[in-house]
């Protein structure tokens, strides 16, 4: 019986550690088809907020050799929670010819606190939190002819399946079992 309770306690501690507000990862898929993009800049907007927030990633690229593009994204947001979800995003400002850039890619959001204004009742237009992230791709095909088409900028986030706001009932249950176990020994 004691071993079972200790097992519950161990699992509860692991769950609580995983639920701590550490660096989060956003996984997303690039489902757009990309052709030759020589001399052009790839940009992607990705909504990372739960409830209609307008903050988004802006991902730009720089070509390091014939077929490899390095992507770097930056985000500024007043939402301290970096969601962990799968999103569908579209590339634009580049020819949409050939299935060449695929995912998923992981974006690590590192949040850094900045001093809040003295008057907290008035919301500040500047973000209270910032983060930066980077990712890379080595699967961009540069054999297609260069085009100048510019599709409209679009965001297509998938259904939000985040459970970060749901209480960890299993961890709470484990601690309750531990308390009962301690009180039972004293009685």
Curated annotation (Swiss-Prot):
Q: Which family does it belong to?
A: Belongs to the ponticulin family.
Protein name (record): Ponticulin-like protein K
Q: Where is the composition biased (Polar residues)?
A: 147-161
Q: Where is the composition biased (Low complexity)?
A: 115-146
Query: What GO terms are given for molecular function?
Result: actin binding
Q: Sugar-bearing residues?
A: 31, 70, 86, 93, 119, 128, 146, 160-161
Question: Which sites carry lipid of kind GPI-like-anchor amidated asparagine?
Answer: 161
Role noted for this protein? Binds F-actin and nucleates actin assembly.
């Amino acid at each position: 019986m004691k071993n079972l309770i200790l097992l519950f306690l161990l699992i509860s501690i692991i769950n609580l550690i995983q639920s701590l507000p550490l660096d989060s990862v956003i996984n997303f898929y690039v489902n757009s088809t990309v052709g030759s993009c020589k001399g052009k800049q790839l940009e992607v907007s990705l909504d990372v907020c739960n409830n209609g927030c307008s903050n988004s990633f802006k991902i730009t690229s720089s070509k390091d050799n014939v077929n490899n593009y390095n992507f770097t994204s930056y985000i500024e947001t007043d939402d301290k929670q970096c969601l962990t979800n799968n999103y569908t995003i579209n590339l634009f400002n580049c020819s949409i010819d050939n299935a060449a850039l695929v995912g998923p890619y992981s974006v690590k959001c590192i949040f850094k606190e900045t001093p809040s204004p003295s008057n907290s009742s008035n919301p500040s237009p500047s973000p209270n939190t910032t983060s930066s992230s980077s990712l890379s791709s080595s699967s961009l095909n540069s054999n297609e002819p260069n085009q100048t088409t510019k599709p409209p900028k679009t965001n297509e986030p998938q259904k939000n399946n985040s459970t970060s706001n749901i209480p960890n009932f299993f961890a709470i249950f484990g601690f309750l079992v531990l308390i009962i176990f301690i009180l039972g020994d004293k009685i």
